[in-house]
Amino acid sequence: MYDYIKGQLTKITAKYIVVEANGLGYMINVANPYSFTDSVNQLVTIYLHQVIREDAHLLFGFHTEDEKDVFLKLISVSGIGPTTALAIVAVDDNEGLVNAIDNSDIKYLMKFPKIGKKTAQQMVLDLAGKFVEAPQETGHTKARSNKAGNTQLDEAIEALLALGYKAKELKKIRAFFEGTSETAEQYIKSALKLLMKG
């Protein structure tokens, strides 16, 4: 198992980043790839969790150990896999998540992608009281870019699709942001807040 990787960030896609270390390029699934935009071609430290399957060995990466801890707690819940946990981490509202779990706010938890009533109830059952204090912000707000607005919105929509949101939901998000000029990372953060409001 890996704890973290330190290497050069060489590539960003809608779903993952690539970090080169000792001549190898590691594909690392992250909650919001565009939050790493300012770190391209720079030395980065990414905290890791490895998932081993019959057909693949997958790496999931995080800005901080707090973010990784939230992810690990989420995947300990029956019915929540790594992709769903990553989508929850991407919302970057740890305080809201912890409050919803501790206060049995099933409706709030069901706003996350792929979380139905049964899984939300299981989250409360398994995780209530497990967060001693709300984890710090995960670092998705760090990156900034000056690329053109439409390209950035396209990248944001692609990243949201990778997190499990439906095209129908994202059509409304695209219409809402059409004509604005933000970074992909900013679009993702704003879109996630809108999606959580319903």
From Swiss-Prot:
* Keyword Isomerase among UniProt keywords: no
SMART domains attached to this UniProt entry = HhH1
> Mind naming one GO cellular-component term on file for this protein?
Holliday junction resolvase complex
Q: What InterPro entries is this protein classified in?
A: DNA_helicase_Holl-junc_RuvA_I (IPR013849), Hlx-hairpin-Hlx_DNA-bd_motif (IPR003583), NA-bd_OB-fold (IPR012340), RuvA (IPR000085), RuvA_2-like (IPR010994), RuvA_C (IPR011114), RuvA_C_sf (IPR036267)
Q: Please give the residue ranges the record annotates as the region Flexible linker.
A: 143-147
Where does the record place the region Domain II? 64-142
Which stretches does the entry tag as region Domain III? 148-198
Q: Where in the cell is it found?
A: Cytoplasm
| One MF term in the entry's GO annotations | ATP binding
Q: Name one GO biological process term.
A: DNA recombination
Mind listing the UniProt keywords for this protein, alphabetically?
A: Cytoplasm, DNA damage, DNA recombination, DNA repair, DNA-binding
Please indicate which superkingdom the organism of origin belongs to: Bacteria
Q: Where are the residues of the annotated region Domain I? A: 1-63
Gene3D superfamilies for the chain: 5' to 3' exonuclease, C-terminal subdomain, DNA helicase RuvA subunit, C-terminal domain, Nucleic acid-binding proteins
Subunit (UniProt): Homotetramer. Forms an RuvA(8)-RuvB(12)-Holliday junction (HJ) complex. HJ DNA is sandwiched between 2 RuvA tetramers; dsDNA enters through RuvA and exits via RuvB. An RuvB hexamer assembles on each DNA strand where it exits the tetramer. Each RuvB hexamer is contacted by two RuvA subunits (via domain III) on 2 adjacent RuvB subunits; this complex drives branch migration. In the full resolvosome a probable DNA-RuvA(4)-RuvB(12)-RuvC(2) complex forms which resolves the HJ.
Q: Which HAMAP family match?
A: DNA_HJ_migration_RuvA (MF_00031)
Domain-level remarks: Has three domains with a flexible linker between the domains II and III and assumes an 'L' shape. Domain III is highly mobile and contacts RuvB.
Q: What does this protein do?
A: The RuvA-RuvB-RuvC complex processes Holliday junction (HJ) DNA during genetic recombination and DNA repair, while the RuvA-RuvB complex plays an important role in the rescue of blocked DNA replication forks via replication fork reversal (RFR). RuvA specifically binds to HJ cruciform DNA, conferring on it an open structure. The RuvB hexamer acts as an ATP-dependent pump, pulling dsDNA into and through the RuvAB complex. HJ branch migration allows RuvC to scan DNA until it finds its consensus sequence, where it cleaves and resolves the cruciform DNA.
Name of the molecule in the record: Holliday junction branch migration complex subunit RuvA
The scientific name of the source species is Streptococcus pyogenes serotype M1
